[in-house]
UniProtKB/Swiss-Prot annotation:
Pfam family membership, one: Lys
Subunit structure: Monomer.
A Gene Ontology BP annotation from the UniProt entry: defense response to Gram-positive bacterium
Span of domain C-type lysozyme: 19-146
EC numbers on record: 3.2.1.17
Swiss-Prot/TrEMBL keywords: Antimicrobial, Bacteriolytic enzyme, Digestion, Disulfide bond, Glycosidase, Hydrolase, Secreted, Signal
Additional comment: Lysozyme C is capable of both hydrolysis and transglycosylation; it also shows a slight esterase activity. It acts rapidly on both peptide-substituted and unsubstituted peptidoglycan, and slowly on chitin oligosaccharides.
Enzyme class: hydrolase
Organism: Sus scrofa
Protein name: Lysozyme C-2
Record GO terms (molecular function): lysozyme activity
Cystine pairs: 24-144, 48-132, 81-97, 93-111
Localization terms from the record: Secreted
Length: 146
C-alpha cells in the first residue's frame, strides 16, 4: 500500500511539471504555426516576448490585482481567457485559461494571434514594450536552424 502511495505521488508530480521550451525549439514551433511576420511581428520579437513573459515556461502564472496571466505568452484573464475567478472577464479568445498551461501551444498561439489583432497589437504585452520594442531582437533566434 505504501508503494502505491509513493507511485501515485511520483506520477502526480510528473504530470504537473512544466514544459520549459528551448528558445530554438519554441521558435520552430512558432514558425511552423505561421507566427513569423504575423500582423507585422517578427519571429524574433515573438521569441523575445515569450522569453521575458515566461522564460518559455508553459506553466507560468502571475497574479495581478484583479486578474491573472497564464502560460508561455502570459495571456491575461481579464481580457483573453476565462479562469472562473476574474470578475467581468471578456474572454475574447473563448478559451479556459487552464488550456494555456499545457504543453500543447496551439491554443496559446491562436490566442496570441487574437491579441495582436486588437488595436494595441503586440504592445499589449508589457514585457515586449520593456525588453523587445525598438531593440535588436535577432539574438533570440540566432543559431536556430529555422
Amino acid at each position: 500500500m505504501k508503494t502505491l502511495l509513493v507511485l501515485a505521488l511520483l506520477l502526480l508530480s510528473v504530470s504537473v511539471q512544466a514544459k520549459v521550451y528551448d528558445r530554438c525549439e519554441f521558435a520552430r514551433i512558432l514558425k511552423k504555426s505561421g507566427m513569423d511576420g504575423y500582423r507585422g511581428v517578427s519571429l524574433a520579437n515573438w521569441v523575445c516576448l515569450a522569453k521575458w513573459e515566461s522564460d518559455f515556461n508553459t506553466k507560468a502564472i502571475n497574479h495581478n490585482v484583479g486578474s491573472t496571466d497564464y502560460g508561455i505568452f502570459q495571456i491575461n484573464s481579464r481580457y483573453w481567457c476565462n479562469d472562473g475567478k476574474t470578475p467581468k472577464a471578456v474572454n475574447a479568445c473563448h478559451i479556459s485559461c487552464k488550456v494555456l498551461l499545457d504543453d500543447d501551444l496551439s491554443q496559446d498561439i491562436e490566442c496570441a494571434k487574437r491579441v495582436v489583432r486588437d488595436p494595441l497589437g503586440v504592445k499589449a504585452w508589457v514585457a515586449w514594450r520593456a525588453h523587445c520594442q525598438n531593440k535588436d531582437v535577432s539574438q533570440y533566434i540566432r543559431g536556430c536552424k529555422l
